[in-house]
Regions:
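Flexible "arm" and connector segments at domain edges
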Residues: 1-105
Length: 105
């Protein structure tokens, strides 16, 4: 199965631009999207609505990862460190999601 999520550039409707992203902007957006997920779950929304809100959170996480790369972090090292942390906490993998970044900025 091949899944695609976009690394966003700019929004032509709202004039948001991820080239000048900041941790404050990401924090605010993450809080907004998190609240929308919580609301959808509490209201027992249809699962499609919950999925849409969860993917919005995922999109903000991608923004954060991109900002880390811009600040000099290596995603491979970060992912490896994260996976080791989970294994050390006793988690066993069920499957693996491979991420391929088509173009780097």
């Amino acid at each position: 199965m091949k899944l695609k999520l976009m690394i966003l550039d700019r929004n032509i409707k709202t004039s948001e631009n991820n080239d000048n992203d900041s941790w404050e902007k990401i924090s605010n957006k993450l809080e907004e999207e998190y609240q929308e997920v919580q609301e959808a779950i509490r209201e027992h929304s249809d699962k499609l609505h919950i999925a849409e809100e969860l993917l919005d959170v995922q999109q903000v996480v991608i923004r954060g990862l991109i900002l880390l790369v811009k600040e000099g972090f290596d995603l491979r090292q970060l992912f490896s460190r994260h996976n080791k942390k989970l294994v050390n906490r006793g988690w066993k993998e069920k499957k693996i999601i491979n991420i391929f970044i088509k173009e780097w900025f």
